[in-house]
């Protein structure tokens, strides 16, 4: 059975390139192409794709907002962000919204094919640079927690009082 993929991308050339590479695969088919967020939001649930490739900054709506709304309605669908944004705010907002993967548009098209396969199997595909940023974020958080654990009881009490004003 083929993996059913939908594309939400307002750049018509990139949208078509994604469709072409998906349809070229024997185990995948592009079941829908959307060039704006409004149509995607209205129609995706009825199509029931296995995987959705979602741009973040569409002309009319935020791809992150669309993912947030649709993940509850479509729990069996994996959403992969496919965007040019590589900043931490966008990455973590997309993942918190329910995206299962995050790719940058500069990735080779075969990486996108592999990401679709990975997401369909329950994985969390990410571009190399994105995965590195996610790891760094958690490593920085670990250092902050370790630093707090080095404080004495009195120092922790002072910090608590300072935080309360």
Model-found features: residue ranges?
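Conserved acidic carboxylate
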Residues: 9
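Regulatory hinge/linker segments at domain boundaries
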Residues: 135-161
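Acidic catalytic/metal-coordinating carboxylates
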Residues: 36, 62-65
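Short amphipathic alpha-helix used as the core "switch/output" element in two-component signaling
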Residues: 64-76
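The feature encodes the CheY-like receiver
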Residues: 59
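Active-site residues of response regulator receiver
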Residues: 55, 83
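Acidic, metal-coordinating helix/loop segments flanking the phosphotransfer/catalytic sites
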Residues: 33-51
